[in-house]
């Protein structure tokens, strides 16, 4: 997609019902790497909004994506009102176009959407304290609980087979067989690591197929910075970035949060001796998550959360290594072997999780382990 100029941004902004003319700033807002995000505000500076250009290379059906977002936020708004909450702060509010649509297609066919700006909030880029991590956990658990009765089958799959770990394994095998850049000879230990865990890749989907765990509405990208925290109270109030809300498993959301939050190193740490899975932070997150989501979960589903931590970490490592074999086309790299370092970090975390897996199960399901 072409770069966003101020005139292009203003043209897109003029398509939305902001309640009057708005001013634009062509500087990107936030930490996101997929969509192009900007802040616009009314001419009298009384209100701010988020204006985004959706990345249609990643999300090929923006209209279906916005149907998901509108359906889910409408459902959340009703739940929040019933609980005496403030839906203007506790879920995203979609701004329609002047013609009443949920998104605007510009002259180049690019898709744009707009939200109210949720004021006086912060989002975390890393775990600063146990309290922070528990706050994120409680907010994500509440999000899952509020969507418990949402019909998952009505949602569009915005990224096909996103957390299908066996499919990620199959893609790795194809990349390994092709070995387009001759890199396979450099990664024999990593290849062996993945091959030894082929059966693990099937655990969660096998449990789903057997009816042991339910298909839910899940977020599927539960990074810390996708939870807005009230700047005054420190409480988590709103889950954002709903583009990957799809049918999925609670283990996906739980596991991805553990993968990114329950360790004390960067995702691309080149020194594997510094990589450490923090079982205590895992427990902090698990207790927070289950305090808001656990009432609707069976013993089997609670046990699946521990598997989610293992498999989301393994899956991510497989994706990094696949991209390394294919020439680093998907994940941005800043140095040679960047994706290899990323994969090795994930595999170190998996290995450490395996060593304490009985304890991980005990933490999420103490009554039936």
Language-model segments: which ranges?
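ATP-dependent phospho-/nucleotidyl transfer catalytic cores
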Residues: 27-31, 52-53, 59-63, 118-134, ...
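Long, compositionally biased intrinsically disordered regions
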Residues: 353-356
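Conserved ATP-binding subdomain of kinase catalytic cores across diverse folds
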Residues: 25-174, 248-250, 261-262, 266-273, ...
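Small/polar glycine-rich anion-binding or flexible loop at a beta-alpha turn
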Residues: 302-312
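Juxta-kinase regulatory segment immediately upstream of eukaryotic protein kinase catalytic domains
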Residues: 1-26
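Active-site activation/catalytic loop segments of kinase-like enzymes and analogous catalytic loops
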Residues: 251-294, 311-330
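Conserved active-site aspartate in kinases
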Residues: 241
């Amino acid at each position: 997609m072409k770069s966003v100029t101020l005139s292009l941004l203003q043209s897109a902004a003029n398509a939305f019902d902001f309640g009057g003319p708005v001013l634009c700033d062509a500087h990107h807002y936030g930490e996101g790497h997929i969509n192009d995000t900007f802040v616009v505000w009314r001419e009298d500076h009384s209100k701010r909004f988020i204006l985004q250009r959706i990345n249609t290379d990643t999300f090929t059906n923006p209209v279906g994506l916005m149907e998901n977002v509108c359906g889910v936020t409408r459902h959340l708004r009703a739940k929040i009102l019933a609980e005496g909450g403030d839906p203007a702060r506790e879920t995203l509010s979609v701004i329609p176009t002047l013609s009443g649509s949920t998104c605007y297609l510009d002259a180049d066919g690019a898709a744009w959407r707009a939200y109210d700006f949720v004021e006086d909030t912060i989002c975390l880029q890393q775990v600063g304290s146990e309290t922070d991590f528990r706050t994120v956990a409680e907010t994500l658990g509440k999000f899952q609980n509020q969507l418990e009765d949402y019909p998952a089958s009505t949602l569009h799959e915005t990224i096909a087979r996103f957390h299908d770990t066996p499919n990620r394994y199959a893609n790795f095998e194809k990349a390994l067989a092709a070995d387009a850049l001759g890199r396979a000879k450099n990664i024999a230990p990593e290849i062996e690591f993945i091959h030894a865990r082929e059966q693990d890749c099937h655990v969660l989907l096998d449990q789903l197929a057997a009816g042991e765990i339910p298909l839910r509405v899940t977020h599927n990208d539960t990074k810390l910075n996708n939870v807005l925290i009230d700047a005054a109270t420190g409480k988590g109030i709103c889950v954002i970035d709903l583009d990957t809300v799809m049918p999925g498993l609670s283990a996906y959301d739980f596991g991805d949060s553990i993968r990114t939050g329950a360790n004390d190193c960067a995702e691309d740490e080149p020194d594997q001796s510094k990589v450490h899975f923090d079982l205590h932070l895992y427990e902090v997150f698990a207790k927070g998550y289950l305090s808001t989501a656990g009432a609707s979960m069976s013993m089997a589903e609670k046990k699946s959360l521990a598997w989610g931590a293992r498999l989301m970490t393994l899956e991510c490592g497989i994706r990094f290594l696949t991209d390394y074999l294919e020439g680093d086309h998907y994940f941005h790299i800043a140095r040679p072997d960047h994706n290899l370092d990323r994969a090795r970090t994930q595999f170190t975390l998996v290995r450490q999780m395996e060593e304490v897996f009985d304890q991980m199960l005990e933490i999420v399901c103490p009554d039936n382990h």
